[in-house]
Amino acid sequence: MAATQYYGTGRRKTSTARVFAKVGTGNIIVNKLPLDEYFGRETSRMVVRQPLELVEMTDKLDIMVTVKGGGNTGQAGAIRHGITRALMELDESLRPSLRAAGFVTRDARKVERKKVGLRKARRKPQFSKR
């Protein structure tokens, strides 16, 4: 691989994203599809672009992503986390601004397991007094 390529692994819920960034024109490719084709929702696309817009590198880097597992929200969050890590590898001075925006911290929230005797993770069966 070329030395001008920067790598970051991002995770969110059950999704894992491998992000490769290199100097380019601003193309974002996710699983061999353009970002706009891969994510139907504008919200997901916005989440993916957030770290690039923060450091004003939207049209300076080409980003290639392979993402596995989870759904749309988890994958978008994982890609954002991976892009953030790749940006920090590119330039460590970006870390404070990315940290302040909350992109560096891995979102540790996961789906809570269903418990025995309950209908869902916390939802109890309906109580009948009589």
From Swiss-Prot:
GO biological process, one term: translation
GO cellular component: cytosolic small ribosomal subunit
Pfam families hit by this protein: Ribosomal_S9
Superkingdom of origin: Bacteria
SUPFAM superfamilies, per database record: Ribosomal protein S5 domain 2-like (SSF54211)
Keyword list, A-Z: Ribonucleoprotein, Ribosomal protein
Keyword Cell cycle set for record: no
InterPro entries xrefs: Ribosomal_Su5_D2-typ_SF, Ribosomal_uS9, Ribosomal_uS9_bac/plastid, Ribosomal_uS9_CS, Ribsml_uS5_D2-typ_fold_subgr
Residue ranges of coiled coil: none
GO MF, one annotated term: structural constituent of ribosome
Entry annotated with the keyword Ribonucleoprotein: yes
NCBIfam families referenced in this protein's UniProt entry, alphabetically: PRK00132.1 (NF001099)
Family statement: Belongs to the universal ribosomal protein uS9 family.
Entries under PANTHER family matching the protein: RIBOSOMAL PROTEIN S9, SMALL RIBOSOMAL SUBUNIT PROTEIN US9M
UniProt protein name: Small ribosomal subunit protein uS9
